[in-house]
Amino acid sequence: TVIFIISCIVLGFAYYQVTSGINNGSIVKIIYVPIILGSISTFFIFWSLSGLLLRIFMSIKKIYYKGLNSFTLRQFSSKINTTVFSTTIICLMLFITICVLSSALSMKNSLNKNLTDLSPRDIELSKSSNVNLEESDLTDIKKQNLRLNFEEIFAKFGFDIDANFKNTVYFSLYFDDSVTLKSTLGSYYKITKKQYPYLRYNDYIILMTNSDYNNLAASFNLEKVTLKSNEYVVVGNYQEMLNIKNEALKRNTKITLNQKSYYPKYQKAINGFYEMESQKSEVGFIVLPDNALSDDKKIMNRMIADYNGNQADIEAKINSITEKTSFYTDYGLTLNTKKDIRDASVGLGAIVTFLGLYLGIIFLISCAAILALKELSESSDNAEKFNMLRKIGVDEKMINKTLFRQIGIFFMFPLL
């Protein structure tokens, strides 16, 4: 009884740790500890339970001596005693089955939710800015094309942006050599370098003006910000990277741009993104006051919009344009649509769901097979025992009912 109670407490603690006690991705290795504890405690639960159950039911004489209950309970107790290890393995397989199935369904639901939250507009376009037009491999025509804006480029293909798009928002991305991951971490850089030595600390951080971000935030249903002349905010949604940047923000880390210092408005990054996607992958860009960024630091112009009219017709027009290789090569454009993102995500979701169901069903079948083989291996012994019952006058109906109960309890017991 003592072993059973202790094992139940340890098993409960292990399940708590697996489900809610461990929620930090940086300590995921610790998850093996509760799994091992759960396995050991499950073994001792079954080891102690057979005799305990028998004693409990023997004390309840009305149940124990009713019909063939005494025979069924002793048979069940004997089976549990001889199958403690295999029953523990089956419980672990069922645990894995539940984890695989729930994880697959959770991932599918998460992908579907992300499609709604992270791809709120129908189309997005981006165009390189401040390209070095003196590069030798650029033709004269390409140099002229790179100077064109979105409307002028599409007009060349007979497509009117104003007529076919609505809710259009334009914004720009900037960079500065002095604003890198290393510089934005400040004093926290040395600590981060030891923990994550392979991060690309010299990569520059994407910058955006306050007004551009607020226009984008209104379109993407994100939180707007109002900055003072010496403030900045970090915006992103990839939590693992944001956890690092939040530590730097808590230290009031300043960034210097054009010999002027800027300090964080908040002590943690705010949720947001500038590129439509199917998963949260924005590692964090910086929003600065409008006068902090100049056009010579602009690296990309972007546009987001909804279709103004029949979606299929507009997409057909766009596809007829993008099928021409010159659209991308001669104009420095990239294009992405909600439909493209959804199609890619649906494929991934289907694969995840299929694998989850496949593995889950395989484990369930394996569990049933182990129990069935155990029953078959003991069928000769059981036959002799039931023959003895016939000899003492027990009718077939009662024997069949007892056999059904015995097998049913044996198959259902690991699920408890």
Regions found by a protein language model. Name each.
Residues 21-41, 327-363, 378-381, 388, ...:
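Peri-transmembrane interface segments
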Residues 115-365:
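Basic-flanked hydrophobic alpha-helices used for secretion and membrane insertion
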Residues 39-52, 306, 364-374:
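Hydrophobic alpha-helical membrane-embedded segments
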Residues 407-416:
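C-terminal transmembrane helix pair
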Residues 1-65, 69-107, 415-416:
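Alpha-helical transmembrane segments, especially those used as permease/efflux helices
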Residues 56, 68-69, 374-388:
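Transmembrane helix boundary and interhelical loop/hinge segments in multi-pass membrane proteins
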Residues 400-408:
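Interfacial transmembrane-helix starts/ends
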